[in-house]
Swiss-Prot record:
InterPro entries recorded: Aldolase_TIM, Thiazole_synthase_ThiG, ThiG
Lineage, highest ranks first: Bacteria, Pseudomonadati, Campylobacterota, Epsilonproteobacteria, Campylobacterales
Catalytic activity: [ThiS sulfur-carrier protein]-C-terminal-Gly-aminoethanethioate + 2-iminoacetate + 1-deoxy-D-xylulose 5-phosphate = [ThiS sulfur-carrier protein]-C-terminal Gly-Gly + 2-[(2R,5Z)-2-carboxy-4-methylthiazol-5(2H)-ylidene]ethyl phosphate + 2 H2O + H(+)
Enzyme Commission identifier(s): 2.8.1.10
Enzyme class: transferase
Stated name of the protein: Thiazole synthase
Gene symbol of the encoding locus: thiG
Pathway: Cofactor biosynthesis; thiamine diphosphate biosynthesis
Keyword terms of this UniProt record: Cytoplasm, Schiff base, Thiamine biosynthesis, Transferase
Family: Belongs to the ThiG family.
Presence of keyword Ribosomal protein: no
CDD domains: ThiG
Source organism per UniProt: Campylobacter jejuni subsp. doylei (strain ATCC BAA-1458 / RM4099 / 269.97)
Amino acid sequence: MQENLKNDKLKIGKYEFDSRFILGSGKYSLELIKSSIEEAKAQIITLALRRANTGEIANILDYIPKNITLLPNTSGARNADEALRIARLSRELGCGELIKIEVISDSRYLLPDNYETIKACELLAKEGFTPLPYMHADLYAARAMRDVGAAAIMPLAAPIGSNKGLCAKEFIQILLNEIDLPIIVDAGIGTPAQACEAMQMGVSAVMVNTAIAEAKDIALMARAFSLAVNAGRAAFLAGLASVSEAKASSPLTGFLRD
């Protein structure tokens, strides 16, 4: 079993990773980012371009170890064209071609616009990006994103920043059943137990930001999430026992007559 875990890679397009825990960076102080990455044992960290201004002295890129893969996002984009402009800027800053597409035109609930996200996926894929669309868990939209070049699908578990957990669990399960791409649960995961539950379902990875950034001990919470993600993945690979009615684990009769 240890060998199975050792060879169990997260594959996104042409990229491979040992860790299945993706760390958000949107709410951290710069000083805590490095220690959080180390405790999380993460190999991917998301990056909002607004925090990577190369003219600032305290540039977030200076706090991220060089061996960590950056996953810049298009946070702030309200439509596909704006997402494309942000992605191009990301590439100019040297952040690579992996890009998390975030297109949100709703300022109240902060729900992703699946229609514009599909368009953004197509535009970015044509320009050589490896797009990972953040989306509301909908099978038809996920199929469309896959067909235009998405390398993975990132459905929300619950509204962003809510810490409500797997509210969209049944819809995520449909994506797992029908979409032959990595499914990465993003947004709404509030506890390590919820991250573990998502991994037990068979999702490829989990991304967490708010639940760690708002913890009293950020580094320790990052470690807790890392352990939970690993435990959930191991449980999925091991094969969970089926849910049934009461079933004795030891003989209930006969032993007194032996």
